[in-house]
Amino acid sequence: MCIALSHSLAALNSGIMSTHQGGSVRSIRPFKSSEEYLYAMKEDLAEWLKDMYHLEIIVDNFTEILENGSVLCQHANNVTEVAREFSVQYPQLAEKLQLPKSGVKLNMMAQPGTFLARDNVSNFIQWCRKEMDIKDVLMFETEDLVLRKNEKNFVLCLLELARRASRFGMSAPMLIQMEEQIEEEIREEMDLPPPEIPVPKPQRKLCDFKNLDQMVQHLVSRCTCPVQFSMIKVSEGKYKVGESSTLIFVRILRKHVMVRVGGGWDTLEHYLDKHDPCRCTSLSHKPAIKLGSLQKQVSAVHEVKTRLTPRLDNPSKVETTLIVSRSQSPLPPVEWRSYSSGRTRTTSSSNSLDNNENSPTFKMSPSDRRSMSTSYRAHERSATPSRKLFTEDNPEPQQLGNPQSVNFRHHHSTSSLASQLTGSEEENSCLSEVFSESQSRRQMGRTTVMSLKEPAMKEAFLSHTQSAHRKVMSATEQNNIQQGSRIVNQSINSQDSRPKTPSRFIRPPSPSKQIHFFHNQQNKGVEQNPKTQINSCTRSPSPVKQTSLTYKQEFTKRPATPSRISSQYKDGDKSAATEIIPSQDHIKSKPSVSSEERTIRTGRSTPTIHLNKNGITYREVSNLPPRMQPKPDALELSHSIERDCMYTPLPIDPEQEKQIYRSLEDEILTNIKVLEGDSEENHPENDSHGFNMLEKSTLPLNASTLKNPSGQGSVPRSGVYINTTWQSGACYDDVITELTKGHVKLNRVDVENWISKIPSKGMVKEAEEAHTSQRNQVRENGHTGAVSQRTIVRKKTPSTEIKGSKPKQLPSQRARQLALENKKKTVDNVSENQASTFSGDSGETVQEKIKLSQGLKPKRTLKKPERVPSIYKLKLRPKIRPRRDNRPEKKPSRIPTPVSYRQMPSRNNGKAVKRTQSYQANKTSAPQTLNESQSSTVILEDLDSDDKTLEHSAPSQAVETPVTIGNDQSKTEEEEESWV
């Protein structure tokens, strides 16, 4: 028979279901996943193990009791004993079945999580695979139980083990017994032969079916869709479901309604969620919560993708509305009844809203999420003509209900409100007044949440708001041109007579349809100032459906920013643009009226920028009365967002532009003075590198403020302030004169020069010129000694100037001086040695040898730095000694030294002698070579890097090289080998 799904039948069965309410609610609670049937299986297995082994095991500590593996191994050994007894009693049947033959080794003292516990679990797994032949798809791993990685496979493995053990007489859980009962029913229906040998089993008492139909009916009737999932009862515990009439077997397992699916089990609720087309497409699923009264039970909310709603223009035609957003909160219950009049529809909808306010489901879910999701659903409907709402009567208290219902109603669109509201204009105005009054009372609690939501919502809806606002303003302006004077007079009279009754309008749902309200307002006797409509701020969350927000006449006026005025009225029509300023004065003239009025607000105060003759002034138009002001944190967040959206850059007058250009020119001139350094570098007393740092430091301060258009005060502009009394340090003509001089040669600047100066290149040029003249004199006269002395003096000149001009010396300059001192000492030592060795020679010969020793500069190679040797060189370097044999029968023999090491000193001595002879033979060409090397040395000394400083000390080593070679000839062969 078909199960009735009406609410009357559910009310009749409420008394019967009262005893099973706890179990039904537990089985139909919302699923996080498909693990609800695991709870029922673990509950059954826990009770089964408790009866067999007298364990204190329940569902909550199911895995904790079994994770050490000792209980599992005991169960495996028990199954093996039962199999042995069965093979003795039924030997013929035992041959057809695969029975376990060996047990499992276990450690009873294993602690959970230890390796001993893992060994127990691993032994049980091997026994299941080898002895019981359980397939891998139903097996679990050690980590699944020890670390709780996969409890599902662990539970399925225990059920499969109990299923196989029940074949040879072992007691089985309730689920296995129900499986066997269902198999017998199928065998009887299909006329299959009974099993060959009935095995006696210790049976347990199964649950009866007296409450099964009521529980199944309760679970199926939770769906509120017009076309519900069909379940037809065939026999006790057997139903046909769906259009395909699939046969299912339903059983009650303690507190769960279980369905036999294939080779396993599932809960009926989860089965319906997977197979009911309506529930498969649902976005949320909430349980039915029973209220205090037993006769009155609110049906559960079931959210679906398609929802049939009546249209305003054609009530007989239905339209499918798609739900766009996932809602974590339920919808109001749908009452499927036909409405004859609009008043009945209004009452039923308000009652349904009031019923939902009392349900715990609404209390658990945030009101803001519900309102947001409801507004998205309302926006999906196509555009329909809007209605006007006026406030002329007092609000009806029975429609007010709860602030949550008003919040739910607040986010509907115009068409959804109009579909629920029919009748006279007075009735609509009453509901609109309720709309605004309840919103003002509820605003304080929602201020913080709404202010946090505004940053995300403002960026998404800003473009739609601006475009729709322009259309309303343009349409209102055209209407104002025709009826301007007459409406102004009527609005003044109406404001004096009824100051607290504002005129309202609702934005049409489609941007293409602009519906004006002046004609109907004249019929009602309530008029509105046309200038107010220009500045009324309306917002819409989508371009299709726009939120129906009502606004007060006086309090929500916000002047347009200068950018908007120029963009809207740039076509030459300036009449509407000039009307904005009087509306601002009109706001100031009536502060008492605007402070008393209340309207629908978004929980923020909007900063507006007024550009008048006295400059720019910021003014905040607050949409809240003083007692309803939001928190300062929420206001700061909304103010910063509004300021970013509403800010318009200031115009720059020609004087400010000229000041900026002058500051740029001075900056360019200062940079040019920094880069040019020839004239300033020649004066060592100037310690600031030829330019005044004071002028550069005061330049940003002078260019830090900007005058307003009238010249009064200073206004911040992007964090830069330009002073009104700015005076430049240089003239514009000086810059032109400096630039017309031509290309300025720039010098290379080192970082160290910002602290202490280096010798200028002018000195290097003078040294080169003097060196060239001296080289010419040497070619004519041939006096090499004088040339070398002049060269040495010339090399000393830059260093002495450096000492005079710099109080501090950097590491690179100290290294350069050390190299020059070493070179000087080396030259003096060489001259003394040459004078003592060749005492019989003339002074000219001694000077020639000094020149030759300086000219013997080797090839440029890497040089070790002159520093203290490392510990490796001092202590850890072994001294190489000749290898000796310690054979007693023979004399110790020396390993000969390689020939290459013996010939190296002699080769070096021969090369030195050859070089000396060649340079003595070529006396005419030697002075020229020496001078060239010295000139290159002078040029290299002007470089500032430390790598070049290392090269200056290379000639000193070159001078020392021949002397060292000459003195080392007396070294023995053994000492040479030791230093190799």
Curated annotation (Swiss-Prot):
Any GO BP annotation: microtubule bundle formation
Residue stretches making up the Calponin-homology (CH) domain: 39-166
UniProt feature, compositional bias: Basic and acidic residues: 366-382, 763-782, 883-892
GO MF annotations, alphabetized: actin filament binding; cytoskeletal anchor activity; microtubule binding
Subcellular location: Cytoplasm, Cytoskeleton; Cytoplasm, Cytoskeleton, Cilium basal body
Location of region: Disordered: 323-445, 474-503, 523-607, 763-980
Bias (Low complexity) ranges: 337-359
Pfam family, one: GAS2
S-S pairs: none
Assigned keywords, A-Z: Cell projection, Cytoplasm, Cytoskeleton
Listed InterPro entries: CH_dom (IPR001715), CH_dom_sf (IPR036872), GAR_dom (IPR003108), GAR_dom_sf (IPR036534)
Residue stretches making up the GAR domain: 207-279
Function statement: Together with gas2l2.S, regulates ciliary orientation and performance.
PANTHER family from the UniProt entry: GAS2-LIKE PROTEIN 2B, TRANSGELIN
Protein name per the record: GAS2-like protein 2A
